[in-house]
Swiss-Prot record:
Quaternary assembly: Monomer.
InterPro entries: Chitin-bd_dom, Chitin-bd_dom_sf, Chitinase_II/V-like_cat, Chitinase_insertion_sf, Glyco_hydro18_cat, Glyco_hydro_18_chit_AS, Glycoside_hydrolase_SF, Glycosyl_Hydrlase_18
Taxonomic superkingdom: Eukaryota
EC number(s) recorded for this UniProt protein: 3.2.1.14
Keyword line: Carbohydrate metabolism, Chitin degradation, Chitin-binding, Disulfide bond, Glycosidase, Hydrolase, Lysosome, Polysaccharide degradation, Secreted, Signal
Biological processes, Gene Ontology terms: chitin catabolic process; polysaccharide catabolic process
SS bond partners: 26-51, 307-368, 448-461
Protein name, per record: Chitotriosidase-1
Signal peptide: 1-21
Region of interest: Disordered: 385-416
Organism: Mus musculus (Mouse)
Compartments where located: Secreted; Lysosome
Pfam name, any one: Glyco_hydro_18
Length: 464
């Protein structure tokens, strides 16, 4: 009895230590600002006490140097990094790459040691200037999608160069070392072709495993976007299209469990059924599902678009749900499947959870009757992260005051403001704490982070 109590105490201590060290890594995108007003998302909409790390997606690359992508990226950087005044423990990273970025610029950059050093120096300068705490490499994928096989070794060299430079810069400057992470695939073929796992794991602070997109409307039958386990009867390659197989692969190839962060999606993959009466897993499909009312992309639905579908079922052996209505079918994750995945990653001793993406959860609590961020808040609770503690009065940062005009134009008296103007940001003569943003001929009014004002000279929010 004494031994069992002692063992229980040890296990409790381990759980407390694990929980306090767990990471909850959340991505946000710089294109969610263009969605319709009800679901438009800016960095200022991020709850600063929700995630331990927030990664801004995406930066680009020009002439082997980090670069912005959207015309107002630098303002969005400021919005994000100002959240650290509310939660000094929050870490922010900048992700470079992404699916649509492709591989060519990465391939050119890693081709020579000189090119890599150009990138390394630009990354150091860019991250420090913009106030980020680290860099996330999202090359999709070295050794794949037109990237030559030699990029596998060159990607390792890039990571080692960055890690060395980040360490040296921290020692010389006295600043906290910049973090270095990477987003990586689940597919065995892509992993084998592009990643020297044991080597890169030594230099990266953590690895974000993209454990989703296992099935999509590119296939002729329905399948789940992110199943935890294989389905009964699956074998061969089909049996590897799940979270457990992906985690096992990365662990077997040499990733320390504490560095592996399990990615989870706040979106679902949708299909159009060949027949509405044949609506199970593996049912024939004719193509992607219809665009969602807010995300407006074929084959993809946000959690806030899928959560209200009535005809919902669970794939018991895969621990995930799907739903259908008429000839539309969607596989997605919900609170229950996130709990199952959180329990799984704790059992495996992984370093935490990653979420793609903040803006596809029901971030306002407007659609699913579960409060704001139901999926991500579930992870925070299940990972035993500390509850948000009230700030003392001197720590409270006032929120930007509500705008008197709608965020989406045209607006009264300003219908023609963006006509003849290039996409970009412009001062608001009536209120220097806000600015006008012209994009595609539409007018938006946006607010600077608290305490900052907009200056036309730098087209940025700065101290008054």
């Amino acid at each position: 009895m004494v031994q069992s109590l002692a063992w229980a105490g040890v296990m409790t201590l381990l759980m407390v230590q694990w929980g306090s060290a767990a990471k909850l890594v959340c991505y946000l995108t710089n294109w969610s600002q263009y969605r319709t007003e009800a679901v438009r998302f800016f960095p200022r909409d991020v709850d600063p006490n929700l995630c331990t790390h927030v990664i801004f997606a995406f930066a680009g690359m020009d002439n082997h140097q980090l670069s912005t992508v959207e015309h107002n990226d630098e303002l969005l950087y400021q919005e994000l990094n100002s959240l650290k005044t509310k939660n000094p423990k929050l870490k922010t990273l900048l992700a470079v790459g992404g699916w649509t970025f492709g591989t060519q610029k990465f391939t050119d950059m890693v081709a020579t040691a000189s090119n890599r050093q150009t990138f390394v120096k630009s990354a150091l300068s860019f991250l420090r200037t913009q106030g980020f705490d680290g860099l996330d490499l999202d090359w999709e994928f070295p050794g794949g999608r037109g990237s030559p096989t030699v990029d596998k070794e060159r990607f390792t060299a890039l990571i080692q160069d960055l890690a060395k430079a980040f360490q040296e810069e921290a020692q010389s400057s006295g600043k906290e070392r910049l973090l270095l992470t990477a987003a990586v695939p689940s597919d065995r073929g892509l992993v084998d072709a592009g990643y020297e796992v044991d080597k890169i794991a030594q230099s990266l602070d953590f690895i974000n495993l993209m454990a989703y997109d296992f099935h999509s409307s590119l296939e002729k039958t329905t399948g789940h976007n992110s199943p935890l386990y294989k389905r009964q009867g699956e074998s061969g390659a089909a049996a590897e299209q799940n979270v457990d197989a992906a985690v096992t692969l990365w662990l077997q190839k040499g990733t320390p469990a504490s560095k592996l962060i399990l990615g989870m999606p706040t979106y679902g993959r949708s299909f159009t059924l060949a027949s509405s009466s044949d609506n199970g897993v593996g049912a024939p499909a004719t193509g992607p599902g219809a665009p969602g009312p807010y995300t407006k992309d074929k084959g993809v639905l946000a959690y806030y678009e899928a959560c209200s579908w009535k005809e919902r079922h669970r794939i018991e052996d895969q621990k995930v749900p799907y739903a259908f209505q008429d000839n539309q079918w969607v596989s997605f994750d919900d609170v229950e499947s996130f709990k199952a995945k959180a329990a799984y990653l704790k059992q495996k001793g992984l370093g935490g959870a990653m979420v793609w993406v903040l803006d596809l959860d029901d971030f306002k609590g407007s659609f699913c009757n579960q409060g704001p961020y139901p999926l991500i808040r579930t992870l925070r609770q299940e990972l035993n992260l500390p509850s948000e503690t009230p700030r003392s009065p001197e720590q409270i940062i006032p929120e930007p005051r509500p705008s008197s005009m709608p965020e989406q134009g045209p607006s009264p008296g300003l219908d023609n403001f963006c006509q003849g103007k290039a996409d970009g940001v412009y001062p608001n003569p009536g209120d220097e704490s806000t600015y006008y943003n012209c994009g595609g001929g539409r007018l938006f009014q946006q607010s600077c982070p608290p305490g900052l004002v907009f200056r036309a000279s730098c087209k940025c929010c700065t101290w008054s």
